Structure formats: structure tokens, C-alpha cells
Regions:
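A structural signal for well-ordered alpha-helices, especially hydrophobic packing surfaces
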Residues: 27, 147-151, 192
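Active-site neighborhood of glycoside hydrolase catalytic domains
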Residues: 183-194
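Active-site-adjacent structural elements in folded domains
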Residues: 43-51, 103-106, 171-182
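Aromatic-rich carbohydrate-recognition surfaces in CAZymes
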Residues: 53-159, 181-185
Length: 194
């Protein structure tokens, strides 16, 4: 696959070791170039649904936490960098983009397209695994502008954030008429602490 081996684990239960090794193999089929629709290591880490190539903020952030362990076989920050490249003048970074058109995917349940603001948490993890100080210097202005947009758009007088419930991506936990969702406000706190 690539020039580096994936990290090896030694565990008394061989079935777990086999699953671990197979997981790295399965990941290869999820690195897709949306323009050519080919599976390539330099593509984006996505799972096409119904022929649509959608990059999701929450999935991209969470995937960076395990991709850092691939010994650079996979780029842990490529998906995140895509979101940074789409930052608007206002500071907005939308939660989903169509990779073929580059356009944000917005709907009536989340007209601003805000996702859980956890980019700083992901960057904190990336820094602790790679010690890339240059990256911190490069992304800090993006993250600051993003948080300024979140404050200006969703922060209320009481200090809490009133984002749409769908921004949490917890569709299996519906909450009608929620105003200050704890998951979104907790994500803001986690993001601010990193």
C-alpha cells in the first residue's frame, strides 16, 4: 500500500489483532478522489452515499483521532484542511460540503450549516501526535475567525449558544423545541479549552 508499515499490536487474543489489521485494509477503500471517483491514497476520507461525495465536519474531526496512528500512510488532517479552505469571509465553516461542486450542503433544519465546533480539539490532538508547531501557527487565525462567527451567530445574552438541534448530528436522539442544546454548548466549551 504505502512505504510505511501500520503500527503493530501484540495481544493475546489473535481475533482482535486480526480485526485491527483488517481495519487498516478496509480504510483504503474510503480514500476517494471525488473528481475521478477512484480510490487513491491522496483522496478524501469519505463514504459515498447514493453516489454523492459528501465531506462531513464531525466525521472528519473524529477520523483524525485514529488516522494519526497510521504512520502517515493516511493524511490525518486532509479532510480538516478542506473545511479550512472553505472558510467564508464571515468566518463561517459549514458542516457538510459536496466534494464534486465544493458547495455547502444546507437544509431547513440547519440553515447556517453549523456543526459541532470541535476543530481546536482535533488540532490539539494532531499537535500532540505530530508536534507540528507550524500547523498551529497556520490554523490559529482560521480557528479564531470561526469562533468569532459562532459567537456572532449563535451566542445569546445569557452566554449560551442557541444552535439548531440538528447541528449535534445526534439524529437518533430527537429533541423537539430545544433552545440551548447541551451537546452543542459542551462542544463549544471543549473547543475553547483547547
Amino acid at each position: 500500500m504505502n512505504k510505511h508499515d501500520f503500527p503493530k499490536i501484540h495481544f493475546y487474543e489473535q481475533d482482535f489483532v486480526d480485526i485491527y489489521n483488517k481495519t487498516w485494509t478496509w480504510l483504503y477503500s474510503s480514500w476517494i478522489d471525488p473528481k475521478t471517483e477512484e480510490t487513491i491514497p491522496d483522496g478524501y476520507f469519505i463514504h459515498p452515499t447514493n453516489g454523492n461525495y459528501v465531506i462531513d465536519q464531525f466525521e472528519s474531526i473524529l477520523s483524525s483521532f485514529f488516522l494519526v496512528y497510521s504512520n502517515r500512510n493516511y493524511d490525518a488532517n486532509k479532510n480538516i484542511d478542506y473545511f479550512y479552505s472553505k472558510q467564508e469571509e464571515s468566518g463561517a465553516i459549514r458542516w457538510r460540503y459536496d466534494l464534486k461542486t465544493g458547495q455547502p450542503i444546507l437544509d431547513s433544519s440547519n440553515p447556517e450549516g453549523v456543526g459541532l465546533p470541535l476543530f481546536a480539539w482535533a488540532e490539539f490532538n494532531l499537535y500532540h501526535k505530530s508536534a507540528n508547531k507550524r500547523r498551529i501557527k497556520d490554523v490559529m487565525p482560521i480557528l479564531q475567525k470561526y469562533m468569532e462567527w459562532i459567537d456572532a451567530t449563535f451566542k445569546q445574552e445569557n452566554g449560551l449558544y442557541a444552535a439548531p438541534a440538528s447541528a449535534s448530528t445526534m439524529f437518533n436522539s430527537p429533541r423537539d423545541n430545544v433552545r440551548y442544546a447541551i451537546d452543542f454548548n459542551a462542544a463549544v466549551a471543549i473547543n475553547a479549552s483547547h
